[in-house]
Amino acid sequence: MRHRHGLRKLNRTSSHRLAMLRNMSNSLIEHEVIKTTLPKAKELRKVVEPLITLGKKPSLANRRLAFNRLRDRDSVTKLFEVLGPRYATRPGGYLRVLKFGFRVGDNAPMALVELLDRPEVEEVEVQEAE
């Protein structure tokens, strides 16, 4: 029986899986939107949402817990100074996983993972040099 085994192995060793999810978490916190495969995106959601919940309560203990999981000072700083206050009133569901077609090489289902309530990026018009 496969009851209560809520982890996708993603065809990796445990150390590789931990490192991959840590790198993807740091990338998502830094860029606020990333493109990856659908199973990885669903696992990433289980990692990042509790981290953002930690970021809503800025205590030293929570900072240390977040640093223990992320191992990146810049990501932890952004988590507590930008993302925590942004989602202070939201009771969960900080990420959106959108299906994004299939990869060209192996037809793997792709997904776009983004943080909700991102500030809109204004497009900068490039003036041509005359």
UniProtKB/Swiss-Prot annotation:
Single Gene Ontology BP annotation: translation
Organism domain of life: Bacteria
InterPro entries: Ribosomal_bL17, Ribosomal_bL17_CS, Ribosomal_bL17_sf
Gene3D superfamilies named among the record's database cross-references: Ribosomal protein L17
Subunit structure, as described in the record: Part of the 50S ribosomal subunit. Contacts protein L32.
Similarity remark: Belongs to the bacterial ribosomal protein bL17 family.
NCBIfam families in UniProt: L17
Name of the protein: Large ribosomal subunit protein bL17
Taxonomic source organism: Paraburkholderia xenovorans (strain LB400)
Gene (UniProt): rplQ
